Swiss-Prot record:
PANTHER family: HTH-TYPE TRANSCRIPTIONAL ACTIVATOR RHAS, HTH-TYPE TRANSCRIPTIONAL ACTIVATOR RHAS-RELATED. This is HTH-type transcriptional activator RhaS. GO terms for molecular function: DNA-binding transcription factor activity; sequence-specific DNA binding. Its main location: cytoplasm. The record marks 241, 250 as: Interaction with sigma-70. Pfam families: AraC_binding, HTH_18. Residues 191-212, 239-262 bind DNA. It comes from Escherichia coli O6:H1 (strain CFT073 / ATCC 700928 / UPEC). Binds DNA as a dimer.
């Protein structure tokens, strides 16, 4: 597995924060780092396989990656990211106690993926741009300023994350997208889902299309197909069983949609013909 080293990304040995844009982020094999990072998805879509678990990411997704996590990107479509790198929560010169603002593992579950709405994403961009402007400065005031901006970024993300901000339709759409990640195999009635998240059906269609480039049903189908592809690669369940487990009632229809999405049949993926190395 590829290991990314801090010496290749941080501007100096004493820099506590670095900015690494990926505009766009192409498919990238599984790797880990000797540093931590906050991945901010600007726009586009892709699959983020995090510690073996696939997540669909779109504009507004924020992912917190620790130095022992492994992850990869695949099936990217105009996916643009900004990575905010930091050496460790306890490696700041002027900040202490940052762990309290970061996601915490509970009962073996690590809430790595958060979502923020578009207006918050704009504020995030402004903070990141200010950090970028000061990257070449190594004096103490500049270091302190960058670390303060990093603290502001964490506070903004924490206050504005999906769990704490449901005041507008954009935030409710983010909640809906997170719900789909957990209920992709369920039979989805879009009228009922819109009501569940206090959105009109028209608003749901418009905002989901703006955020992902896909209609609601197309997004759900892609999500199901991504989960199915992951199971084909990493489980021994039959193609038919995987189709049913991922929300498809007809395995033939599943195979047709799968080939249309990936240009490979489910059996091709199972046999590794697409060249994916497990």
């Amino acid at each position: 597995m590829t290991v990314l080293h801090s010496v290749d990304f941080f501007p100096s040995g004493n820099a506590s924060v670095a900015i690494e844009p990926r505009l766009p982020q192409a498919d990238f094999p599984e790797h880990h780092h000797d540093f931590h990072e906050i991945v901010i998805v600007e726009h586009g879509t892709g699959i983020h396989v995090f510690n073996g678990q696939p997540y669909t990411i779109t504009g507004g997704t924020v992912c917190f990656v620790r130095d022992h996590d492994r992850h990869l990107y695949e099936h990217t479509d105009n996916l643009c990211l900004t990575n905010v790198l930091y050496r460790s929560p306890d490696r700041f010169q002027f900040l202490a106690g940052l762990n309290q603002l970061l996601p915490q593992e509970q009962d073996g579950q690590y809430p790595s993926h958060w979502r923020v709405n578009y207006s918050v994403l704009q504020q995030v961009r402004q903070l990141v741009a200010q950090m970028e402007q000061q990257e070449g400065e190594n004096d103490l005031p500049s270091t302190a300023s960058r670390e303060i901006l990093f603290m502001q970024l964490l506070l903004l993300l924490r206050k504005s994350s999906l769990q704490e901000n449901l005041e507008n339709s954009a935030s409710r759409l983010n909640l809906l997208l997170a719900w789909l990640e957990d209920h992709f195999a369920d039979e989805v009635n879009w009228d009922a889902v819109a009501d569940q998240f206090s959105l009109s059906l028209r608003t749901l269609h418009r905002q989901l299309k703006q955020q992902t480039g896909l209609t609601p049903q197309r997004y759900l189908n892609r999500l199901r197909l991504m989960k199915a592809r992951h199971l084909l690669r990493h489980s021994e369940a039959s193609v038919t069983d995987i189709a049913y487990r991922c929300g498809f009632s007809d395995s033939n229809h599943f195979s047709t949609l799968f080939r249309r999405e990936f240009n490979w049949s489910p059996r091709d993926i199972r046999q590794g013909r697409d060249g994916f190395l497990q």
